[in-house]
């Protein structure tokens, strides 16, 4: 029987095994391969597993070990999914598709289930195409996105936002890392902002994707007007979307969450990201579409 698993550190509290079991009714095994030595974990994959998911801090290490890549994975330069094939180890990035699906659901509730039922394993492609076109109608001017954090998840978020048609700014604790991404992907015309400009950038942008694992102090400085946005009454547009990767210990919580709601912004939990990257990624392992409703029960 084919075996699957997750590489990362720490991962002892990961929901991935439960999601995988729910998605396939226990048909396949899914193990946690935890440890700080990526080489040792990768050797375990080579010896015993058909496919693995990869989480922090190893997404860029995984990318470098692959023999070939899907198109967006190659562009992003990080992988959260490795699969053995007759042609070698394939790297994919279901963070990218998970982000696309999460944002699609935020702007158009119900679209994921509808498209999954209609298009099966190609649903994420159809969702991407449909939402990219639809967003041009939802906004009366070019929408703007801010991606905070430029690790593996941040790279995927930046490409996803740009692919959906957002003018995208990158922000990182070290601006040089953000600039490196911008230089590597000139086709997206990424802007690099300083972390000191976080509050002003949140107010200006329509979409904020926060991928840092920790909370920056400026989050607590955000007020209702920042979440409403600077052009709230000038241009018709959807509510501001705050999308956070960290579902275990979110940075947007407590009083700032109350101000977010008062400003009519929409918060999207990292649970959605986890769910939809699993949905679009697991099919690459098995060739079978997992049970989305059963996976939702895990969340």
What are these regions (language model features)?
Residues 174, 198-226, 235:
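Rossmann-like NAD(P)-binding element
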Residues 8, 91-96, 103, 107, ...:
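Glycine-rich adenosine-cofactor-binding loop
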Residues 61, 216-243, 255:
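Rossmann-fold NAD(P) dinucleotide-binding segment
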Residues 57, 210-214, 246-247:
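Short glycine-/small-residue-rich Rossmann-like dinucleotide-binding loops
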Residues 166-185:
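NAD(P)-binding Rossmann-fold cofactor-contacting core
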Residues 2-115, 122:
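Phosphate/diphosphate ligand-binding glycine-rich loop within oxidoreductases
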Residues 241-292, 298:
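Rossmann-fold NAD(P)-binding glycine/threonine-rich loop
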Residues 39-41, 187-205:
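Short acidic low-complexity segments
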């Amino acid at each position: 029987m084919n075996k699957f698993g997750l590489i990362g550190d720490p991962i002892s509290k990961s929901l991935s095994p439960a999601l995988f079991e729910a998605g396939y009714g226990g048909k396949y095994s899914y193990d946690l391969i935890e440890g700080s030595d990526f080489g040792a974990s990768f050797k375990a994959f080579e010896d015993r597993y058909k496919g693995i998911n990869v989480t922090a801090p190893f997404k860029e290490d995984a990318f470098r070990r692959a023999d070939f890549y899907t198109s967006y994975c190659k562009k992003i330069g990080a992988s959260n999914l490795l699969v053995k094939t007759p042609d070698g180890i394939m790297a994919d990035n279901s963070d990218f598709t998970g982000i696309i699906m999460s944002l699609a659901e935020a702007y158009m509730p119900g679209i994921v289930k509808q498209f999954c039922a209609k298009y099966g394993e190609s649903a994420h492609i159809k969702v991407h195409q449909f939402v990219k076109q639809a967003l041009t109608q939802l906004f009366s001017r070019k929408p703007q996105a801010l991606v905070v954090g430029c690790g593996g998840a941040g790279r995927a978020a930046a490409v996803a936002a740009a692919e959906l048609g957002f003018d995208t700014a990158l922000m990182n604790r070290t601006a040089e890392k953000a600039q490196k991404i911008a230089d590597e992907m000139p086709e997206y015309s990424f802007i690099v902002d300083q972390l000191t400009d976080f509050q002003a950038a949140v107010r200006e942008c329509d979409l904020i994707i926060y991928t840092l694992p920790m909370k920056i102090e400026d989050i607590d400085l955000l007020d209702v007007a920042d979440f409403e946005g600077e052009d709230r009454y000038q241009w018709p547009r959807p509510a501001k979307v705050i999308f956070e990767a960290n579902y275990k210990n979110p940075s947007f919580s407590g009083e700032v969450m109350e101000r977010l709601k008062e400003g009519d912004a929409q918060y999207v939990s990292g649970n959605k990201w986890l769910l939809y990257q699993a949905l679009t990624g697991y099919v690459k392992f098995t060739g079978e579409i997992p049970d989305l409703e059963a996976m939702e029960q895990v969340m």
